[in-house]
From Swiss-Prot:
<keyword id="KW-0545">Nucleotide biosynthesis</keyword>
<feature type="binding site">
    <location>
        <position position="263"/>
    </location>
    <ligand>
        <name>(6R)-5,10-methylene-5,6,7,8-tetrahydrofolate</name>
    </ligand>
</feature>
<feature type="binding site" description="in other chain">
    <location>
        <position position="21"/>
    </location>
    <ligand>
        <name>dUMP</name>
    </ligand>
</feature>
<comment type="subunit">
    <text>Homodimer.</text>
</comment>
<dbReference type="GO" id="GO:0004799">
    <property type="term" value="F:thymidylate synthase activity"/>
</dbReference>
<comment type="pathway">
    <text>Pyrimidine metabolism; dTTP biosynthesis.</text>
</comment>
<feature type="binding site" description="in other chain">
    <location>
        <begin position="207"/>
        <end position="209"/>
    </location>
    <ligand>
        <name>dUMP</name>
    </ligand>
</feature>
<dbReference type="GO" id="GO:0006231">
    <property type="term" value="P:dTMP biosynthetic process"/>
</dbReference>
<dbReference type="GO" id="GO:0032259">
    <property type="term" value="P:methylation"/>
</dbReference>
<feature type="active site" description="Nucleophile">
    <location>
        <position position="146"/>
    </location>
</feature>
<dbReference type="InterPro" id="IPR023451">
    <property type="entry name" value="Thymidate_synth/dCMP_Mease_dom"/>
</dbReference>
<feature type="binding site" description="in other chain">
    <location>
        <position position="177"/>
    </location>
    <ligand>
        <name>dUMP</name>
    </ligand>
</feature>
<protein>
    <recommendedName>
        <fullName>Thymidylate synthase</fullName>
        <ecNumber>2.1.1.45</ecNumber>
    </recommendedName>
</protein>
<feature type="binding site">
    <location>
        <position position="169"/>
    </location>
    <ligand>
        <name>(6R)-5,10-methylene-5,6,7,8-tetrahydrofolate</name>
    </ligand>
</feature>
<comment type="function">
    <text>Catalyzes the reductive methylation of 2'-deoxyuridine-5'-monophosphate (dUMP) to 2'-deoxythymidine-5'-monophosphate (dTMP) while utilizing 5,10-methylenetetrahydrofolate (mTHF) as the methyl donor and reductant in the reaction, yielding dihydrofolate (DHF) as a by-product. This enzymatic reaction provides an intracellular de novo source of dTMP, an essential precursor for DNA biosynthesis.</text>
</comment>
<keyword id="KW-0808">Transferase</keyword>
<keyword id="KW-0963">Cytoplasm</keyword>
């Protein structure tokens, strides 16, 4: 994943010093795009070990429309622990917005179900979009959405997807985000009998936290290795019926993990 390392190097060498919500301090750039051809391999970074297990369980949690941490804790996934309240709830974050966006008349919109219908019956639509940026509910969320909007695109039986991410934690968050959306595209493509195309990632405020700079320098010294392949072992009846054991990663040979503290 040379694209990721090139962006990391750009932020490290040319990023502007900024203050931030967490008071940690960042080096930041604004606006960048990366493209990943999913037919060339699954984009899971190899210059450090990335915890695919957490990525899979988090995505299944989102797809379920869940916002309570209990499901993640049951499966020993801790990536949201810093933001929970005393009841283990995170407010109307991604899963709620994807599956049950509230409307003015009190009803709900299942954006993902609508997207699946469009991909199957009207794949040329320019409205195959899912948004998590519900302005009316942001203050109720434990953390405002970072990856805010994604759009699917079908051409000649090939499925691509573009994500806009308003805020990007380059060292800890972005590797998860890239792999999570790549996983989602694999699942959607299987459900819709489409071939894999590109994942296009577009970032807004792309930053390295100052307490991640030593780890960044270490990672930039490492050479990327061949990408693994993602194998989906069965085809469930719908997008919302996948299970963790449906996924198998072949050929993942990363460098050792690099630990870093999350900025809260």
């Amino acid at each position: 994943m040379k694209q990721y390392l090139e962006l990391m190097r750009l932020v490290r060498t040319q990023g502007i010093s900024k203050v931030d919500r967490t008071n940690t301090g960042t080096l930041s750039i604004f606006g960048h795009q990366m493209r990943f051809n999913l037919s060339h391999g699954f984009p899971l970074i190899t210059t450090k070990r990335c915890h695919l297990r957490s990525i899979i369980y988090e995505l299944l949690w989102f797809l379920n429309g869940d916002t309570n941490i209990n499901y993640l804790r049951k499966h020993h996934v801790t990536i949201w622990d810093e933001w929970i309240n005393e009841k283990g709830d995170l407010g109307p974050i991604y899963g709620r917005q994807w599956r049950a966006w509230g409307t003015a008349d009190g009803s709900y919109i299942d954006q993902l179900s609508d997207v699946m219908l469009q991909l199957k019956h009207n794949p040329d639509s320019r409205r195959i979009i899912v948004s998590a940026w519900n302005v009316g509910e942001i203050k109720q969320m434990a953390l405002a959405p970072c990856h805010v909007l994604f759009q699917f695109y079908v051409a000649n039986g090939v499925l691509s997807c573009q994500l806009y991410q308003r805020s990007c934690d380059m060292f800890l968050g972005l590797p998860f985000n890239i792999s999570s959306y790549a996983l989602l595209i694999h699942m959607v493509a299987q459900q819709c009998d489409l071939q894999l195309g590109e994942f296009i990632w577009t970032g807004g405020d792309i930053h390295l936290y100052r307490n991640h700079l030593k780890q960044t320098d270490l990672q930039l010294k490492r050479n990327p290795r061949p990408l693994p392949q993602l194998i989906i072992k069965r085809r469930p009846a719908s997008l919302f019926q996948y299970q963790f054991d449906d996924f198998y990663l072949s050929g993942y040979d990363p460098h050792p993990a690099i630990k870093a503290q999350v900025a809260v």
